[in-house]
UniProtKB/Swiss-Prot annotation:
Originating species: Xenopus laevis
UniProt-recorded name of the protein: Vacuolar protein sorting-associated protein 26A-B
Stated family: Belongs to the VPS26 family.
Database matches in PANTHER family: VACUOLAR PROTEIN SORTING 26 RELATED (PTHR12233)
Subunit and partners: Component of the heterotrimeric retromer cargo-selective complex (CSC) which is believed to associate with variable sorting nexins to form functionally distinct retromer complex variants.
Membrane topology: Peripheral membrane protein
Function, as annotated: Acts as a component of the retromer cargo-selective complex (CSC). The CSC is believed to be the core functional component of retromer or respective retromer complex variants acting to prevent missorting of selected transmembrane cargo proteins into the lysosomal degradation pathway. Retromer mediates retrograde transport of cargo proteins from endosomes to the trans-Golgi network (TGN).
Record's subcellular location: Cytoplasm; Endosome membrane; Early endosome
Entry's Gene Ontology cellular component terms: cytosol; early endosome; endosome; endosome membrane; retromer complex; vesicle
Main localization of the protein described in the UniProt heading: cytoplasm
Top-rank taxon, per record: Eukaryota
GO terms of biological process kind: intracellular protein transport; retrograde transport, endosome to Golgi
Lineage, top ranks: Eukaryota, Metazoa, Chordata, Craniata, Vertebrata
Amino acid sequence: MSFLSGLFGPICEIEVALNDSDTRKVSEIKTEEGKVEKHFLFYDGESVAGKVNIVFKQPGKRLEHHGIRIEFVGQIELFNDKSNTHEFVNLVKELALPGELTQSRSYDFEFMQVEKPYESYNGANVRLRYFLKVTIVRRLTDLVKEYDLIVHQLASYPDVNNSIKMEVGIEDCLHIEFEYNKSKYHLKDVIVGKIYFLLVRIKIQHMELQLIKKEITGIGPSTTTETETVAKYEIMDGAPVKGESIPIRLFIAGYDPTPTMRDVNKKFSVRYFLNLVLVDEEDRRYFKQQEIILWRKAPEKIRKRTNFHQRFEPQEPQASAEEPEI
């Protein structure tokens, strides 16, 4: 597979072909418009190598330039501030000195063992992307084309992965005990738990478990939080009784979430919460949120040769102003 730039006027087009394109995996990522794009998948520390092909479309033409270069770029873009684009990685390879092209030409490039410290991400208010950028420098207008890559950050099994167990309630009205089997889940994991009713003196009509994603961008007073309900799991529909125990099984893989991302380059975070919601007969809603960590498990082949590890320290979740917390 190669990346095709499209025409730059009538003279030439640019192609980028990776050396291992026949064997390298492809991954998907959603754009701001909700479309799904496929790009080659890379991990931290892997080299990026290939060829840049300048292909002439009209024989006999010539292209004067002031140099040709390729860059490997890692970039964070905040959608509410397009001018505040931050590059956390920028590697440059000069492919050609100033001169003139009269026919098609290929240039080899290689970025060795490239540091890729963060996962590719496309959210509501922020985008983190990696791309190759080819520039043909010209006197008036440069010819520039970008080719996106996808990066996944991998983690090993956490050293400690305690269960979550908590007793909550409303005094003399409702007391429940909920338990989740872990506090940290990989993206193909299953959330297993149970809800146990210790005291029920209000009429509960409906109960569900939600997987909530919070995207936090900015710092201090300029902080923006975008909340999305990734998944809903109906625990029960009807009134529970004292002593009743209800099991929970929520398959994370069916909802394709991202990993938890903590203070990425001091620009944004992505956090996940399990939100237990109860609705009574008067349509009043009660909830209890508990933060969990989502992480991407290394494939077996990679896990054998590399010791990936990420550590996360959960912070206290913030209560919603819209619903009373139990």
